[in-house]
From Swiss-Prot:
This is Transcriptional adapter 1-1. The lineage of its organism: Eukaryota, Metazoa, Ecdysozoa, Arthropoda, Hexapoda. The gene is Ada1-1. It comes from Drosophila melanogaster (Fruit fly). It holds the Pfam family SAGA-Tad1. GO terms for biological process: regulation of transcription by RNA polymerase II. PANTHER family: TRANSCRIPTIONAL ADAPTER 1. Component of the Spt-Ada-Gcn5 acetyltransferase (SAGA) complex consisting of wda/Taf5L, Saf6, Taf9, Taf10b, Taf12, Ada1, Spt3, Spt7, Spt20, Sf3b3, Sf3b5, Nipped-A/Tra1, a histone acetyltransferase (HAT) module made up of Gcn5, Ada2b (Isoform B), Ada3 and Sgf29, and a deubiquitinase (DUB) module made up of not/nonstop, Sgf11 and e(y)2 tethered to SAGA by Atxn7. Not a component of the Ada2a-containing ATAC complex. Its main location: nucleus. One of its GO terms (cellular component) is SAGA complex. Belongs to the TADA1 family. GO terms for molecular function: transcription coactivator activity.
Length: 308
């Protein structure tokens, strides 16, 4: 339903613009690439539209934004309190439901508050020429995108870019499942990249067939030490319990085990260091992480430029 609305308003706008449709689409790309603000895009669009055609621009923009917002998860409204005389049990039930709803509808904090000052210049949005600094600070909330917010793109974010790209190459529309699939693929790719970087730095264990890894950061055991207390013995005979548990020999054996375990522990704690660009470069030497050669070469060039 929303897709049909977008296509209908888009066709009406194309007919109204005529040859200016390419210019309108280029302006929209500048807005989506955060080169322009929404106000700048709206101002440039009004220059190529007559006053009697402005409503088509507003209808198309509203339909497109509704299409993108449809991918956002719905917020559960807080539970409405109703008068009832069922006693304390119903009151406890209402209180628990209200607490659960409040837990879902939490308020997000500003991510930039938790970023070090050294990295603020990297993630700050680009300044707009000709706009005072006070107005730029007011437009900061509307100019922040995935690179500035440090969040992964969601399906709605991807859907808007897909529609512009599809119209640019002559396609009619994009299926809704494509945006969700790409958003999930981005999450899996980022997970694989982070896992590869961490596994290059830390020891880890794998399952029997080597398909799954776990216990990342486990200390590497000294092969010269043989821990007979915690070592698993598969071929051992059944354990024979001592009938006299309160004897001095039993207590002395427990103390010996504690001393032996303390001797097998690490003498120096593991030093924790920050992940650097060199770690990323070493991890990306595995060509199976990024299958596309174009994406791999571009990002490796950027990584090398940041290191030098």
């Amino acid at each position: 339903m929303l897709t049909d609305r977008v296509l209908a308003t888009k066709e009406a706008l194309v007919v109204a613009l005529g040859d200016n449709w390419e210019r309108y689409r280029a302006n929209m790309k500048n807005w989506f690439r955060s080169r322009w603000t929404k106000e700048e895009f709206d101002a440039e669009s009004r220059k190529i539209l007559t006053p009697d055609k402005l409503h088509l621009h507003n209808q198309f923009l509203l339909a497109l934004l509704n299409k993108i917002d449809a991918f956002a998860p719905l917020e559960n409204p807080p539970a409405v309190q109703t008068s009832s005389s069922s006693g304390n049990r119903s009151k406890r039930r209402k209180r628990s439901c209200r607490t659960f709803a409040e837990r879902l509808n939490f308020e997000l904090s500003d991510v930039l508050d938790f970023v070090a000052e050294d990295n603020m210049q990297i993630i700050r949005p680009p300044t707009t020429i000709g706009i005072p600094s006070d107005q730029q600070q007011q437009q900061l909330q509307s100019q922040r995108y995935c690179a500035q917010e440090l969040f992964l793109p969601d399906a709605g974010f991807i859907m808007g870019r897909f529609l512009i790209g599809a119209w640019e190459i002559g396609l009619v529309s994009v299926d809704d499942n494509v945006a969700e699939y790409v958003a999930m693929a981005v999450q899996v790719l980022l997970k694989d990249l982070l896992s590869a970087i961490i596994k290059k730095r830390k020891h880890y264990k794998t399952s029997g067939e080597g398909n799954f890894y776990y216990d990342v950061g486990a200390p590497l055991r000294d092969p010269s030490l043989r821990n007979t207390v915690t070592r698993q013995k598969v071929d051992d005979t059944p354990l024979e319990l001592d009938k006299e548990l309160n004897t001095a020999n039993f207590m002395r054996r427990q103390n010996d085990d504690v001393t032996f375990l303390s001797a097998c522990e690490e003498v120096q704690p593991t030093e924790r260091t920050v992940i650097t660009l060199k770690d990323c470069q070493l991890a990306l030497r595995d060509r199976n992480l990024i299958g596309s050669h174009a994406v791999y070469s571009i990002n490796m060039e950027r990584l090398n430029m940041m290191m030098h």
